[in-house]
Amino acid sequence: MSLSEARYHDLVDAVQESVEDVFDDTSLDVDLENSGGVLTVRFDNGSQLILSRQPALRQLWVAARSGGFHFDYDEGSQLWLCDASGERLGELLTRVTQEQGGEALEFEDL
């Protein structure tokens, strides 16, 4: 069963809030901007990490220096999973913050 639009938006809101909280609780120097459903993380080296919602597809898209990734929400595991690799969103974010920010942050519940 696919996600309702309301549930989808609630889930993406929660992800973006959690991501912001992780960055707020670290000493990593980043600028955060959340506008129009798009969360942009700017690292001090000029690279960006962008989390954007794709409501028509009920997906969460992540753009990073290493590429673009599309995530579907899995109700069984209650996790966002990459539609190409099956990687958990939290694993990808940890890897990307290491690659782009030089610090592997923990995004455990994503």
UniProtKB/Swiss-Prot annotation:
Query: What are the entry keywords?
Result: Iron, Metal-binding
Query: Gene3D superfamilies in the record, alphabetically?
Result: Frataxin/CyaY
| Matches recorded under CDD domains | Frataxin
Q: Which SMART domains match?
A: Frataxin_Cyay
The UniProt entry's GO biological process terms, in alphabetical order, are: iron-sulfur cluster assembly
Give an example GO molecular function. Answer: ferrous iron binding
Q: Which InterPro entries match?
A: CyaY, Frataxin/CyaY, Frataxin/CyaY_sf, Frataxin_CS
Keyword Protease belongs to the record: no
User: Which residues, if any, are the signal sequence?
Assistant: none
Specify whether Iron is a keyword of the entry.
yes
Q: What Gene Ontology terms describe where this protein resides (cellular component)?
A: cytosol
The Swiss-Prot or TrEMBL record describes its family as follows: Belongs to the frataxin family.
Functional summary from the UniProt entry:
Involved in iron-sulfur (Fe-S) cluster assembly. May act as a regulator of Fe-S biogenesis.
Q: What NCBIfam families does the record point to?
A: FeS_CyaY
Name of protein: Iron-sulfur cluster assembly protein CyaY
Please name the taxonomic classification of the source. Answer: Bacteria, Pseudomonadati, Pseudomonadota, Gammaproteobacteria, Pseudomonadales
